[in-house]
A protein has these predicted regions:
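Metal-dependent amide/peptide-bond hydrolase catalytic core
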Residues: 4, 11, 174, 183-292
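Short glycine/serine- and small hydrophobic-enriched flexible loop segments
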Residues: 22, 118-125, 207-214
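Active-site beta-loop-alpha junctions enriched in small/polar residues
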Residues: 29, 77-79, 140, 168, ...
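Active-site metal-coordination/substrate-binding segment of hydrolases
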Residues: 69-134
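Acidic/histidine-rich catalytic neighborhood of metal-dependent amide-processing enzymes
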Residues: 109-181, 185
Length: 292
């Protein structure tokens, strides 16, 4: 196969910016990234790169990959969250202003995605490298989905280390907090709003929410700081004149290396009256040694 990958910095940079503009213009919400996966796959193939695909994950090995050498993974994601109501620009129209490229996913994590691809293409045809390179543009990062990087890691073999592109203000990150989503339900007694009722499920939920807001976990991580709990969703009632007997709310919990997700859930249950159930314990905090 003819090798077409560019090998000069200027061309790589210009191509990366154009690719990022094209990615921004295509909606790629988590689990709906098929069109950006198509674009990335086609782009690499046009550069002479043999690609592999599983669902919306695209990856490639450098041309002279050798099983005898250690391997570096270059990884970032091409899915995005949905734009919020505060957007002042069209999220799908890439705009260059004051030397910056604006658009949904330009920073998280399109910039890193195309930069790592440029680095991969630069070394793609190189001979006598000390390391192999694998480039992986993966899906479902924003929703911590099961069909993202976790699902394709077995295809990569043993890795010496990975460079994962995320917007960290160009600071090396060696640890990340875990994530646990907890669904809670406060109970009360239903009645007409005109009647006296001191067992309003909403008020009962608010007492628990106040504890969640103010509680400080005793142990603080040297690298990750404190466990953070934030109530992000609350629902109750359907009629203005009826006191609801249930109030549900959701807690976004960011855990550290000081507590497992299961330990945090146990602490929550011991301190609130609402029922509390974790959607998953899968995403505990992770880190590598400070002197790595």
């Amino acid at each position: 196969m003819e090798q077409k990958s560019p090998n000069n910095f200027l061309e790589l940079g210009e191509n990366a910016v154009e690719l990022l503009k094209n990615l921004i213009s295509i909606p790629s919400f988590s689990k709906e990234e098929d069109k950006t996966a198509d674009l990335i796959e086609k782009y690499l193939q046009e550069k002479g790169v043999k690609t592999h695909r599983e669902k919306n994950n695209i990856w490639a090995f450098n041309h002279n990959f050798s099983p005898e050498k250690p391997t570096i993974l270059l990884n970032s994601h091409h899915d995005t969250v949905r734009p919020n109501s505060g957007y002042t620009l069209d999220p799908f129209t890439p705009i260059v202003k004051d030397g910056k490229l604006f658009g949904l996913g330009s920073n998280d994590a399109g910039g890193a995605l195309v930069s790592l691809m440029a680095a991969f293409l630069y070394f793609y045809n190189a001979k006598d490298l000390k390391y192999n390179f694998i480039y992986a543009a993966t899906a479902e990062e924003e929703n911590s989905g099961l069909d993202g990087v976790e699902s394709v890691l077995p295809h990569f073999g043993n890795l010496e280390f990975a460079i994962v592109g995320e917007p960290t203000e160009m600071q090396m990150a060696i640890a990340e907090k875990g994530l646990m989503v907890v669904d809670c339900e406060a109970s009360g007694t239903s009645s007409h709003a005109a009647h006296f009722n001191d067992d309003n499920a909403i008020y009962n939920a608010l007492k628990d929410i106040e504890w969640i807001k103010n509680y400080q976990f005793p142990n603080t991580s040297e690298v990750l700081g404190d466990v953070k709990m934030t109530v992000t969703v609350i629902n109750a009632g359907k009629l203005h004149n009826m006191v609801p007997n249930t109030c549900t709310f959701t807690i976004d919990v960011r855990t550290t290396d000081q507590y497992s997700n299961r330990e945090v859930l146990q602490i929550i249950r011991e301190n609130i009256k609402s029922k509390a159930e974790a959607r998953s314990f899968r995403l505990n905090s992770s880190s590598i040694p400070l002197d790595h």
